[in-house]
């Protein structure tokens, strides 16, 4: 893309969760036309889009039908479970796939992105191996050593991930990973357990006609492989920030295209270790809804459309904490919102998901304070005040 783009553009979002919802809101503010696609009706992004479609995104025929129907200018994947081979066909026909069809194919699978980073680009990662059967997993785990981390090569929001402390826990980890694998993959990755000081996400914005730029690193904490809270700034040294930026630029340059990438790292006392990469807004980056002048969704949109990003300003010590469901519910109701919002510099986002189940992310609390510790306390306190029920 070398010319100034004309608005509105027609954007097709593949996957319509809470990240997609905030992206659609950003797109609508600049008058764009958005088609939200997902496997179930009334997904969060569908609630704010111009129109929506319910399909299996693993079906090449279903994807062909919706793309033919709407003829979008851009196809923007928001999830992993997509028939990525079809995206290459769309790109060959002149539709812009974000970041590119090839990059999407790489990053939909942990094995491909890990091999790109470690084997092709020579970047330090945790030691790793793969397994497609329980017997292989036992052998690979013995080779990697204990404790280790087992994950599906394709999953959503960290689901299916577990820390395996002993050989006796391997079978349970296998069952959990396969049960939470997305798409048609039955393959798991086993990683060396890194004794890190902090995990960070470096939001990396790759532009069509301007240099790659970065947000301030975001610290985050996970449970069950899924993010629970995040904060910005992360509080790591300038030399480690520069090292993480150099690694992120190397990987995203290899992938190409444009848009925001959530690049995850383990930060140890002495090292910056590449972990994972998502070619889209990152769940931990929801803190930017309160912490930056331009949030990650606005940055993604500007990068996609080739619009300028003159400055990313970090607005102080901020944090986010997830609001999780504890039981299975249809048409969930929320109480405690008024109590949560009574605290200054606190905001709440409820995602509008039509159903709930244990540990499903239903919303997020956002907070700002005079330091990171207080911001984290305010966010988790606000999240704890929100209760989800059927009546």
From Swiss-Prot:
GO molecular function: ATP binding; magnesium ion binding; phosphoribosylglycinamide formyltransferase 2 activity; phosphoribosylglycinamide formyltransferase activity
Catalyses which reaction(s): N(1)-(5-phospho-beta-D-ribosyl)glycinamide + formate + ATP = N(2)-formyl-N(1)-(5-phospho-beta-D-ribosyl)glycinamide + ADP + phosphate + H(+)
Top-level EC class as recorded in UniProt: ligase
Nucleotide-binding as UniProt keyword: yes
Presence of the UniProt keyword Membrane in the record: no
PROSITE patterns linked: ATP_GRASP
Gene3D superfamilies reported in the protein's UniProt record: 3.40.50.20, ATP-grasp fold, A domain, ATP-grasp fold, B domain
EC number of this enzyme: 6.3.1.21
Function: Involved in the de novo purine biosynthesis. Catalyzes the transfer of formate to 5-phospho-ribosyl-glycinamide (GAR), producing 5-phospho-ribosyl-N-formylglycinamide (FGAR). Formate is provided by PurU via hydrolysis of 10-formyl-tetrahydrofolate.
Family indicated by similarity: Belongs to the PurK/PurT family.
Protein name: Formate-dependent phosphoribosylglycinamide formyltransferase
Chain's gene name: purT
């Amino acid at each position: 893309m070398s010319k100034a783009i004309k608005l509105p553009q027609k954007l097709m979002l593949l996957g319509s969760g809470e990240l997609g919802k905030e992206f659609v809101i950003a797109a609508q503010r600049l008058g764009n036309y958005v088609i939200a696609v997902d496997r179930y009706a009334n997904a969060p992004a569908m609630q704010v889009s111009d129109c929506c479609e319910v399909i299996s995104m693993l079906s090449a025929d279903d994807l062909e039908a919706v793309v033919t129907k709407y003829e979008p200018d851009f196809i923007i994947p928001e999830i992993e479970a997509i028939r990525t081979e079809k995206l290459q066909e769309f790109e060959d026909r002149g539709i812009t796939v974000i970041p590119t069809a090839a990059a999407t194919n790489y990053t939909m699978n942990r094995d491909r992105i890990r091999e790109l980073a470690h084997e092709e680009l020579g970047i330090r990662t945790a030691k790793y191996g793969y397994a497609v059967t329980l017997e292989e997993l036992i052998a690979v785990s013995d080779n990697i050593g204990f404790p280790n981390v087992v994950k599906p090569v394709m999953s959503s929001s960290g689901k299916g991930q577990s820390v395996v402390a002993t050989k006796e826990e391997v079978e349970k980890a296998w069952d959990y990973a396969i049960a939470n694998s997305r798409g048609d993959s039955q393959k798991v990755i086993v990683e060396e357990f890194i004794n890190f000081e902090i995990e960070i996400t470096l939001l990396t914005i790759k532009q069509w006609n301007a240099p790659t730029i970065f947000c301030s690193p975001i610290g985050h904490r996970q449970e069950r492989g899924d993010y629970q809270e995040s904060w910005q700034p992360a509080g790591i040294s300038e030399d480690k920030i520069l090292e993480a930026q150099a690694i992120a630029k190397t990987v995203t340059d290899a992938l190409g295209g444009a848009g925001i990438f959530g690049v995850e790292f383990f930060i140890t006392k002495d090292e910056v270790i590449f972990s994972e990469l998502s070619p889209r807004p990152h769940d931990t980056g929801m803190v930017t809804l309160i912490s930056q002048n331009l949030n990650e969704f606005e940055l993604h949109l500007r990068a996609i459309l080739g619009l300028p990003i003159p400055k990313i300003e970090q607005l102080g010590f901020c944090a986010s904490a997830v609001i999780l469901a504890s039981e299975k519910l249809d048409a969930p109701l929320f109480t405690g919102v008024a109590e949560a919002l009574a605290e200054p510099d606190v905001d709440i986002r409820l995602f509008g998901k039509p159903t709930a189940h244990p540990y499903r992310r239903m919303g997020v609390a956002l907070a700002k304070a005079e330091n990171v510790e207080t911001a984290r306390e305010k966010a988790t306190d606000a999240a704890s005040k929100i209760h989800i029920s059927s009546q």
